[in-house]
Amino acid sequence: LAIVIERLRFYHRNPNNGAAFMKKVKGAFFAGNYLDAMKICRSENTPLANVIAAGIDHLDLGKENLLDVMRQEAMVQVKKYERHLGKLATIASITPLLGLTGTVTGMISSFAVISTVGIGDPTALAGGISEALYTTAAGLMVGIPALVAHNWCEAKSLEFVEQVEMYSL
């Protein structure tokens, strides 16, 4: 939950609204006001603005070197978008397995009861079956939202990469 909240806050602070930002930057840039374009980038202070600022900062380089600088900055910024995605993926894949482990231990408990009491008393089996169902449900209740959150965060990251490619490279 902490990872999801942190990612929500990050994406809220860094919306992928590159069109409005780029319109302002291009206006200043093509008017020859490079300093104003840089000020717009600094005031925006988003990952896309940082990539564009890196390019403006290195206008004296040749085209290929300028693109390299922007690619390097884009890679730094993409890492900000991808932060904790591996952890979310791990949580999403492991929690159903932990639930399955609980299912197995619950069934083992049920069979242990059968071996000692016999099958005549269904209430004796209920504890093991209940354990199996609760742990399965718990694993799914954590795993499914984690998978949804991971996919959403991954989509936001891809959206950012596409914006960088469209506007800067």
Predicted features by range, described:
Residues 14-101, 105-119, 148-169:
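Predominantly long cytosolic amphipathic alpha-helical stalk/bundle segments
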Residues 2-5, 91, 95-101, 138-142:
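Lipid-exposed faces of alpha-helical membrane segments in multi-pass integral membrane proteins
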Residues 123-150, 154:
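Pore-lining and gate-forming transmembrane alpha-helices of multi-pass membrane transport proteins
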